[in-house]
Amino acid sequence: MNDIFLRKPSYRSLATPTISQRVLPLLIPVIIFIVALLPRLANLDSFITADEDDQIMFSSLFLKSALTGDLSNALVLGYPGVPTLILGATGVGLRYAAHYSGLSPLPWVTADLMTTLRETTLERGVFAHPLDFIVWVRAPMALLAALCIVAIYLLIRRLLGEPLALFSTLIIAFDPFILAHTRVIHVDAPLAYFMFVSFLAFLLYIIHGRWKFLIISGLFAGLAALSKTGPSAFLGPIMAVGGLAYVLLYPLAKGQTRWMLTRRLMFALGGCGLIGGAAFFALWPSMWSQPFFVINWIVRNLQSVNRSAHPTTGVFWGGGMTDQSPYYYFFVLPFHLTPLTTVGVLLALSMIIWSGINLLRKMTLRPWVAEKLPLVIALVFYVILFVGPISMVSRRGDRYILPVFFATSLLAALGLWWFATWLIRQILRLRIARFYLTKKNSTPGRLLGGVILAQITAILMYHPYYLAYFNPLLGGGQMAQHYLNIGWGEGLDTAARHLNDITKGRPEQVASWYSSQFSPYYQGRTVDLSDINAALYSPYTVFYINQAQRGFPSQEILEYFHQRQPLDVVKIGGVEYAWIYGGPILSSEPTNSYMFPVGTILGGAANLLGVDVNQQTFAADAFVGQAKVSESKSPPVFSDHAPGLPITLHWQTISKVPGEHNVYIRLLDEDGHVWGKVDRLILAGLWRPDRWRPGFVIRDEYRLPIDPATPPGKYHLEVGLYDFVTGQTYGIAKNIGQITLTPAKTQPNVNDVNVPHRLMTAINQPLTLVGHNYNDVTLTPGAEMNGKIFWQANQPLDRDYQVQFWLQAPKGQAVRTLKNVSATTQKDDRYIVYES
C-alpha cells in the first residue's frame, strides 16, 4: 500500500541501500501515526460537546437499522454522515459487546441487545447515558483521523519531499482547531480530512498523470460527500482552480506541454466526479433502496439550512458583532490560527506577491519557488472558495470552516520554509557565519524544528480543552469572546465536579445550560436552564459562556445573575467559561441565620428578615464603583464582574403588592451622608411583587458600589421600598448592622471620584477645591441642607485649615456667616472630604 504514495527509487547508479534507508521511509509514517493518535486518545471522557449525545443516539439508530436490515431507517441526519455513523455504530456495538461479554457491565442494561437498542432510541434527541459510550465512539474517530494524517503526509511527501512533508504534517496534526475536532464524534472532521486528501491526490494526478492518484482523489471526494454533501460540493471549484494554477505555472517536465496538462485537468475533473459519485452510491446503503427519496431529502435539508439561522444564533458581548454578519468567518479563521500558522500564511501571501512582481519584470524565479508557487496559489483559493460560499449560508458555526485549516496549515508551512530558506541564504553571506555554518548543516528544517516543537508544547498545555485555544497574537480567548461564539461544552464537566465537591454526597438540584453536557458528570438531578423557574427554584445554577454570549434564556435573567457573586468560576486558558451560583432564589423556608437580622415589614407586604454582606470589615477602596443602569440590549459580559459590595436581602412575602416597586440600599455614615447606593427592581424584575403570595422566601442579591472618596470609618446600611412610578414610599429599614472601612490600599484618582459640581479651584499650592454636591434648593425655616465638599491634597499638609460657610445675596454681598469648622490635618490621605 505504501507503494501508492512513494516514488520508487532507482538504484542503477547507487550502492545497495542501507537498512536505515529501507526502514526509515516506512518507520516515519508509523511514528507520525502514533504521535498524531496519542493526544487524540488521551482523556476522551473529559467532557461532552453539545452535539455528541445526539451523535450517539444517531449511531445507535444506525446500528439498529443495520442489524435489522432496515436500510430505509438509516436516514437519521439531515445529511448523509455515513462515515461518522459507521464509526459511531462500531463504537456503540463494541460497548454493548463489552457489556454482554462481562468485560465491562452496564448496570442499567437488563435486556438483550435489540431490546436495549429499541429502548434507548425510543425518544429521539434524548440519550440517557452518553458517558458510558463517549470513549467508545470517539476512539474510532481519533483512529481514522490519525490514519488520514498519515495519508496526508505520504501525499505531501510525493508533492514536496520528505523534510517539508514532515514539517507541514506536524503543523496539521497539532493544529489546535483540527486536534479538537478530530477528538469528538461529528461529521465535520471526516469532511475536512477527506476533502484535503482528495485535493492533494488530485494535484498529484495533474503533475504525474498516474491513475492511482485519480482513484484516490475520487474515492475520498465520495467519502467527503458521504460526510456532508453540501460543503463537499465546494471541492469541485477548488480542484478546478487549483489544477488551473498548475496548468499555467508549474514548470514543465521534459516532453510536457501546457495543452497536455490542460487535457489532464479536464479529464481529472470528470473522472474524479464519476469515481466520487460511484463511491457515494456504493458506500451509502440508503441509496440502494430509495435513491430518489434520498436525493430529494438532501436537497430539502440544504434548502432548510440556508433559509434558517442556527437556533442559538445571537449577538455577542458588546452588541457590535453577530454570527449573522457576512464577515463572521473572517473573524473566526484568524482567531483559531496559531502564531506559527498566522506568520506562515502571511509569508506565503508575501511569496505570491514577490513572485508576481518578479514575473512581471520578466525575471526567472528560483526553481524551488517556481515549483511550489502553483501549490501556494491553489491553497489560497482553497480557503477563498470554501469560506466565500459558506458565508452565504444562514446557519453559522466555526467548525463549519474546519476544512480550510488543513489548507492554511500547509500554506503556512510553505511560507515559513520559503522564508527560512531565504534567511539562511542571507546568513551564509555573512563572513563570520562561514566559520560556524555550512550549507549542509544550515537547513530550513533545522531552523524551524525548534519553532514547531515550541508551538506543539504550548498547544498540548490546553489538553484536553483544545477548543479553548485562541490565537494569542489577537489577544487569545479574552478578545475572541467578543467576536465569536465560545464554548461547546468544555468546562461544564469541571463545573459538575466542583458541585459534587460542594454538595459532598448530598447532591441537590442544579439548573444548567447545556444540561445534557453537564448532567453526566453531576451526581444529582439536573434541569435545563431554559426558563425563569429553573433559575428561581434550583439550589444551584450554572451559567455557561455560550449561553451568556447569546443572551439565553433571557436578558433579565442574565442581568440579574451578572450582579450576583458566583460561588465558583471555571476558567480555561484564563477565560471564564462557567459560573456557579447558589440558591434557591425562591423557597418556602427561611434560613433564620443572617449576618444582620432585621425583621422590618415594609408596605405591609414584605418582611425584611435579614441582610448578609460579603465582608463586614474591608479597605475603603475594596468595592469602589459607580451605580449604573444598563440600557444595552446586548447580553451582559459575565466575565466583567459588576463592581460593588455583594449584599443579600432576605424577604418573606406577606401579600402581593400592585404597582412597580424598587428597592434601594444605601451605605451611610454616622451623620447620615450617603457613600454608596444601589436602586433597582426586586430580583431585577424576574418576580414582580404583583405575583407575590404569602409565605415565599426571596433571596435577592445586589452589588453596592462604594464611592471612591469614602473615608475610613463606621457605616451602616439602609433599605427602602418604594413605587418608582409614583414615588410613594413603603417604608425604610434604618441602621442595619455595622460596616467598618479601613484606610484605602490605593488612593483614588481625582477623575474617578463622583463630583456632581466639579470646580478644581486651587486654594494654595498644597490644597485644591475639587468640587461639591450641593444643588439649588428652596429652604423653609428650620430646614437643613446637607452635602459634601471634596478637597485634593497635592502634598502632605503641615497645618490645620478652617472652612467657613455663608449665605450670599444675588448681588454678591455676604448676608450671614453660617459656620466655621476646623479641618484636621491629614498627611496620608490624598482626598479630604468636608461634610456639612
Predicted regions and their residues:
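Membrane-lumen/periplasm interface segments of specific transmembrane helices
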Residues: F267-S304, V451-A468
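Interfacial juxtamembrane loops and adjacent helix segments
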Residues: Q55-F58, K64-P140, F292-M321, H482
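Signature aromatic-anchored transmembrane alpha helix within multi-pass, membrane-resident enzymes
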Residues: V30-F33, M239, G273-L274, I353, ...
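Transmembrane-helix motifs of polytopic, lipid-linked glycan transferases
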Residues: A139-L160, V197, A201, I357
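Membrane-interface helix-loop-helix junctions at transmembrane boundaries of multi-pass membrane enzymes
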Residues: I19-V23, R158, Y250-G270, A348-V380
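Short helix- or helix-capping micro-motifs
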Residues: I32-A36, S168-A173, A180, L200, ...
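Membrane-interface transmembrane helices that cradle and orient dolichyl/undecaprenyl
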Residues: R157-L159, P163, S198-L214, A224, ...
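C-terminal luminal/periplasmic domains and tails of membrane-associated envelope-modifying transferases
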Residues: N2-Y11, T16-I19, G476-S836
